[in-house]
Regions:
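Short, solvent-exposed amphipathic helices
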Residues: 91, 102, 116-127
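C-terminal peripheral helix-coil segments that are non-catalytic and often amphipathic
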Residues: 91-94, 98, 126, 130, ...
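Short, hydrophobic secondary-structure boundary micro-motifs
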Residues: 104-106, 148, 178
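All-alpha amphipathic helical-bundle segments outside canonical DNA-binding/catalytic cores
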Residues: 83-86, 119-124, 141-159, 189, ...
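Helix-turn-helix
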Residues: 12, 16, 20-54, 58
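Short helix-capping/turn signature of helix-turn-helix
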Residues: 49, 108-113
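Short, basic, alpha-helical segments at the C-terminal edge of helix-turn-helix-like DNA-binding modules
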Residues: 61-68
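Hydrophobic alpha-helical connector segments
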Residues: 58, 72-101, 151-158
């Protein structure tokens, strides 16, 4: 129907924007380039989004929102803080592995000077950190995480560490693929290796 076609076009624009912004950076991205990659007209783009900033905001709100939902679900089920944090970091890394373009946008936007984030984006960022902080504090109560650690600082550090480390592993996998290795196997091996290291980090970093 008409709605499903509109949704497909919207998704097409978002995927094109992720590709272009992750390659060029936000400042050097134009709506013209996004519509060229998406294969749609400028009029169609402006029917769905009011501006380049609107497109970027939607990408980040959608992506961060999914990560927050995953974290909340994990926190509600995990029997211990260590298991919750391990699963959260693993889920976060898996999300970035599935969509490296989104990861590159997120890492640049999180720390970009003068960023203009919408209220929904600020709220999601705060919620993401709050869920992590809650599990770190839970670990302190359970005795698995040192009591002298600043939980708020640790939450920010975890996000930065997982994001940048995952992108590092993705780049290594891309280089292996460029050298002739099987692309799918290179990425699978990189993700497996990172998962093991995440588990080791959570179990031993705060001992």
């Amino acid at each position: 129907g008409r709605t499903s076609k509109a949704d497909a076009t919207r998704r097409q624009l978002l995927d094109a924007a992720i590709e272009v912004i992750s390659e060029r950076g936000y400042a050097d991205t134009t709506v013209e380039r996004i519509v060229e990659v998406a294969g749609v007209s400028k009029g169609v783009a402006y029917y769905h989004f009011s501006s380049k900033a609107d497109i970027a905001t939607y990408i980040l709100v959608e992506g961060i929102g999914e990560i927050v939902d995953d974290f909340v679900a994990i926190a509600g089920k995990a029997p211990s803080a260590v298991e919750a944090l391990t699963a959260m970091m693993d889920s976060f890394a898996a999300t970035i592995f599935r969509n490296a373009g989104f990861g590159r946008i997120l890492v640049s936007e999180l720390w970009r000077r003068g960023r203009e984030w919408s209220e929904p984006m600020r709220a999601l960022e705060e919620r993401l950190l709050a869920v992590l902080r809650g599990q770190i504090e839970r670990g302190q109560r359970e005795g698995s995480i040192r009591g002298d650690i600043d939980a708020a600082f640790e939450a920010v550090a975890v996000v930065g560490m997982v994001l940048t480390t995952t992108l590092h592993y993705i780049r290594e996998a891309e280089q292996r693929a460029e050298e002739g290795c099987d692309c799918a196997e290179a990425f699978a091996a990189a993700e497996r290796s990172l998962t093991v290291r995440i588990c080791d980090y959570v179990h031993h970093a705060n001992a």
